[in-house]
Amino acid sequence: MEVTAHYIGGKPFVGDTGESFATLNPATGEVLAHIEQADERVLAHAIESAKLGFSVWSSMSAAERSRCLLKAAQLIRDHNDELAELEVRDTGKPIQEASVVDIATGADVIEYFAGLVNGLGGEQQSLGSNQFFYTRREPLGICAGIGAWNYPIQIAMWKAAPALAAGNAMIFKPSEETPLSALKLAELFTQAGVPDGVFNVVQGDYRVGQMLTAHPEIAKVSFTGESGTGKKVMADSAATLKPVTMELGGKSPLIIFDDADLDDAVSAAMVANFYTQGEVCTHGTRVYVQRAMYDAFVEQLKERTEKLIVGDPMNMETQIGSLISKSHLEKVLGAISSAKESGATLLTGGFQVTERGLEKGCFVAPTVFVDCRDEMPHVQNEIFGPVMSVLVFDDEDEVIARANNTQYGLAAGVFTQNLSKAHRVIHQLQAGICWINTWGNSPAEMPVGGYKLSGIGRENGQETLLHYTQTKSVFVELGAFDSPYA
């Protein structure tokens, strides 16, 4: 099988590094491609290419950059089905998700920043009759994006959109588990007229990430991944004082009060745990249900969860796809075993699905544990699989304290018909992304990111564009220079 490589300088690039790795379809075990591992020479070539691209791109007007990005967004939409299928084969997620969410929401973000950048400007202020100052918002230079494997192309677009809109170049490293869709995205940027070298893709494992974060010519790093790796990214970046944006792990609370709509609450809990087979950092895996609703909630949850369809991700009927890898499958099954040993009651699921031709994949039945306690390992630790923990609570103050008793602070949600209560509770929850009577919505206009060990900085929204710029202040004297020296 031919080795697939990088995308540098507006075209595919093979560095002849002598090292490669296979990327698999996790649902079938099929080898999709062999990917070249980048080395120092490949990265050096990407840096030089990005320098050239940056010199051209940053000299273009905001309107010119906006037109290129809008064309790219339309090309991405035109290739929605092709990109969705590629994403499904590389991640194992259901096509019914990828075909309507992953590609479209990424294109939304590109369009959003393409529109926003036209209003990006500085300020001017008079300091008297002969003096004034003005500021300029200037691009940083070459930015690095390091992606995760659960939403590969969406994450690539979320990172590229504000960086490119502000006039920067980007070197993007996808996860070695899901390296394919970023290459197609790079092609589409080139087709849209984005200058060569502005968006480059380098492939490889953690070693490539370390080279990027430590490189003195990388001006900023945006990373999505787990919290432990995020600490290493931040430490490496600190050596050259480069700013970082990090969207990290979570163990988010979903709080359901007894006045909530039961059907909606159960629906939200299922989406917040089983969407993308549980491999979503913002998932609400700690589901707190007020005692008066608990029994009815658990009864409906069990019935509806057992109707979910686990199957071939390319089948439009499938609702639960394959986990990303055999090693991750073992991790999730290990967490399920630990939950049983800790005394939680298995309500449903809890096993690997192997029938109907799924034996070569990494499928886990949607799993729900009840009779959970806050100190149980599966309640405290991020599992990143279709495993829900249901906990009972009695009053508002109690559940707020319990919900906040975690090292993470990525997301939180509240279901109640009392909007005063909803806002009161949300304002006390230590989380950066919050929902009231819904779960998971993340429009381009809304900044997203975490508190505590769940991250630094934000993606999407107006403030993100500013983080890809630096402020230059210019003081102007119109009169004679007033020197203190004779």
UniProtKB/Swiss-Prot annotation:
Task: Identify the residues that bind K(+) 1.
Answer: T23, D90
Any binding details for the cofactor?
Answer: Binds 2 potassium ions per subunit.
The EC code for this enzyme is: 1.2.1.8
To which pathway does this protein belong? Amine and polyamine biosynthesis; betaine biosynthesis via choline pathway; betaine from betaine aldehyde: step 1/1
Q: Where does K(+) 2 bind?
A: L241, K452, G455
Species annotation: Vibrio vulnificus (strain YJ016)
According to UniProt, the reaction catalysed is: betaine aldehyde + NAD(+) + H2O = glycine betaine + NADH + 2 H(+)
PTM sites of type Cysteine sulfenic acid (-SOH): C281
Q: What does this protein do?
A: Involved in the biosynthesis of the osmoprotectant glycine betaine. Catalyzes the irreversible oxidation of betaine aldehyde to the corresponding acid.
Q: Does the keyword Oxidoreductase apply?
A: yes
Question: What cofactor requirement does the entry state?
Answer: K(+)
Can you say what this protein is called? Betaine aldehyde dehydrogenase
The biological process GO terms on file are: glycine betaine biosynthetic process from choline
| One example GO MF annotation | metal ion binding
Q: Which residues form the active site?
A: K159 (charge relay system), E247 (proton acceptor), C281 (nucleophile), E459 (charge relay system)
Q: Which residues bind NAD(+)?
A: G147, A148, W149, K173, P174, S175, E176, E226, S227, G228, T229, G249, C281, E382
Q: Which UniProt keywords apply?
A: Metal-binding, NAD, NADP, Oxidation, Oxidoreductase, Potassium
Please name the taxonomic classification of the source.
Bacteria, Pseudomonadati, Pseudomonadota, Gammaproteobacteria, Vibrionales
Please give the superkingdom of this protein's source.
Answer: Bacteria
Tell me the subunit arrangement. Dimer of dimers.
PANTHER family per record: ALDEHYDE DEHYDROGENASE-RELATED (PTHR11699)
**Stated family:** Belongs to the aldehyde dehydrogenase family.
